[in-house]
Every structure is written in structure tokens, then in C-alpha cells.
Amino acid sequence: ADAAKACVGYLSEQPPLYPEMTVQEYLDFVAELKGVKHAQRKQQVLAAARRTGLEEVLPRVIRSLSKGYRQRVGIAQALLGSPQLIILDEPTVGLDPAQVIEIRSLIRELGKAHTVILSSHILSEVKAVCDKALILSQGHLAAVVDLAAEERDLEELFLELTAPEETSDKKED
């Protein structure tokens, strides 16, 4: 279980941030929780801050940050420990349009070095940052879609695949 945890970075829809901590303190704390050795901790925190555009706000208290910067802090903590897989749950929810563009760009950049799984109900978000989409319906995999090759509109495809099946009683009406 510990080996699996070390390979995965996770950002929940509502990142569990400690508003009274500075960004630096929080990232150091998470790195320690993830078992990053003390000698590597400072380097990993700075690398995660650099990749997420947080270098300038490391000394700031988290409660003073905008929602977009808080999301960046959440993504930075997911990068600590150098995971191969990063899971992002609704990473742009509640962000303004400029922040959405910044986070999308960051996710695409992360995809160059990591496997990124994006969980989202916002299909335009999926189209903007993903190569493939896995569509789930009632807890089951309904389709794997290569977004570059798919000619149909993703929203239409989603509705087609997830529409409730008509029962024989309804067909008679």
C-alpha cells in the first residue's frame, strides 16, 4: 500500500489546505507526510513551487491567496514525492476564466512528465486538456474515447452513452 501511495499524487475537489500556514510551511509539511527525506525536501518543495508558479507566494499565508493560487498549492502538494500518476478531481471548479486557462495550461504541462487522470463533469474541460476520455455510466466504463480521432461532439456522445435505457413498459406507451 505504501509503494502504491508513493506513486500517486492526488488533488481533491476541495484541497485540504491549512489556511493559517504559509505556502512554504504547508508544502514542507505535506512533503514530510509523504515521506520525502529531509535532505530532499527543500529541493522538492522548490521544484513543485516552480512548476506550479508559486515561487513568489511561498512566504504568504494560504488564507490570503486567491482560489486559483490555492488550486496551484493543491497541485503542488500532489507533485511532492515525484509521483508517476497524478489524479486531479475537478481542478478548475470555482475558478474565474483566466484562472481556468492557467490551470489547463499547467495540467497539459504536467501531462508531459506524468500520467494525469482528470476527473470532471465539465466536458469542455476534458476536451481542452485530455488526449483520451473514459466515460463512466452508473459506475461502469461505457467508452474509451480518443479525443483527437473522435468526430462526434463529446457532449452528444456522453448523452448517448449515459442515457437511461427505455423499459419495455415505456415503449408500449
Where are these regions (language model features)?
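Conserved ABC ATPase "signature" region
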Residues: 28, 32, 39-57
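A short, proline-enriched helix->beta-strand linker immediately N-terminal to the Walker B motif
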Residues: 80-84
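Helical segment within the ABC ATPase nucleotide-binding domain
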Residues: 100-112
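Conserved ABC ATPase signature
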Residues: 61-68
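Catalytic Walker B motif of ABC-type/P-loop ATPase nucleotide-binding domains
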Residues: 86-90, 95
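Hydrophobic anchor residue at the start of the ABC signature
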Residues: 75
